[in-house]
Regions:
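Sec-dependent bacterial lipoprotein signal peptides
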Residues: 1-16
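Predominantly soluble domains enriched in secretory-pathway, periplasmic, or organellar proteins
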Residues: 18-179
Length: 179
């Protein structure tokens, strides 16, 4: 009986090792330049955030465009999105990532990782942006061209109240940041 269990366990392991994981098929898109993106936050800790696109010319909504274009899920809690120079920057809070996507094809062109819990991104130039985070007394400095963190600004007196994190440059004890 014991050897039968071992054989069954070994068989299950072998079968699982041979499985091919299907993440879905990638679709091709060519969106107009006048559409509207909708971040669907999803349920906290369920990894079911999605991105939708509304085309005002055809009056249609395309749901789950990130998944359909990239054959992978967006992640856990899509917090916000900013568009700069035909690149959409989708901030996914609980997945600790900011995805850069082409706004016409919805394909991922890059990502910024290793963030604590990002909420919003604000661009200063093509090579510098600030990222606010919840539960972190720092504003991260990132290089959008290289998709990397280049530094951070400590804000030691900043409280963990979410309204402070929701507005870049609105903290009354600190002057505007000029770097």
């Amino acid at each position: 009986m014991k050897s039968l269990r071992i054989i069954l366990l070994a068989l299950c392991v072998c079968l699982a090792a041979c499985m091919e994981w299907d993440y879905g098929l990638e679709e091709e898109f060519n969106a107009s330049s006048e559409g509207l993106f909708i971040c669907n936050e999803g349920n906290f800790q369920y990894g079911n955030a999605t991105l939708s696109y509304y085309d005002p010319h055809s009056k249609t909504v395309q749901n789950e465009i990130f998944y359909r274009a990239n054959a992978m899920k967006l992640g856990d809690v899509a917090q916000s999105m900013v568009i700069r120079d035909s690149i959409g920057w989708v901030v996914v809070n609980n997945s600790h990532v900011i995805f850069a996507i082409d706004i016409h094809t919805f394909k991922e062109v890059g990502r910024i990782t290793n963030l604590t819990s990002p909420r919003y991104i604000h661009f200063l130039s093509d090579e510098k942006a600030y990222v606010t985070q919840i539960w972190d007394n720092r504003i991260f400095i990132v290089n959008p061209k290289r998709y990397e963190i280049t530094g951070y600004i400590d804000i030691p007196n900043m409280t963990m109240d979410p309204p402070i994190h929701d507005q870049l440059g609105r903290h009354t004890e600190h002057p505007p940041l000029i770097l």
